UniProtKB/Swiss-Prot annotation:
PANTHER family: PHOTOSYSTEM II REACTION CENTER PROTEIN T, PTHR36411. HAMAP family: PSII_PsbT. PSII is composed of 1 copy each of membrane proteins PsbA, PsbB, PsbC, PsbD, PsbE, PsbF, PsbH, PsbI, PsbJ, PsbK, PsbL, PsbM, PsbT, PsbY, PsbZ, Psb30/Ycf12, at least 3 peripheral proteins of the oxygen-evolving complex and a large number of cofactors. It forms dimeric complexes. Found at the monomer-monomer interface of the photosystem II (PS II) dimer, plays a role in assembly and dimerization of PSII. PSII is a light-driven water plastoquinone oxidoreductase, using light energy to abstract electrons from H(2)O, generating a proton gradient subsequently used for ATP formation. This is Photosystem II reaction center protein T. Keywords: Chloroplast, Membrane, Photosynthesis, Photosystem II, Plastid, Thylakoid, Transmembrane, Transmembrane helix. One of its GO terms (cellular component) is photosystem II reaction center. It comes from Bassia hyssopifolia (Fivehorn smotherweed). The chain crosses the membrane at residues 3-23. Pfam families: PsbT (PF01405). The lineage of its organism: Eukaryota, Viridiplantae, Streptophyta, Embryophyta, Tracheophyta. It comes from the Eukaryota.
Amino acid sequence: MEALVYTFLLVSTLGIIFFAIFFREPPKIQTKKIK
C-alpha cells in the first residue's frame, strides 16, 4: 500500500508542476496535437 501512496504523490506532484508550467507559459506546440 505504501508503494501506491508514494507513486500517487509522485505523479500528482509532477502533474501539478507540469500544469503550472503549462498554464504559465503558452505551449508552442499546436493544441490539436495535445488533444
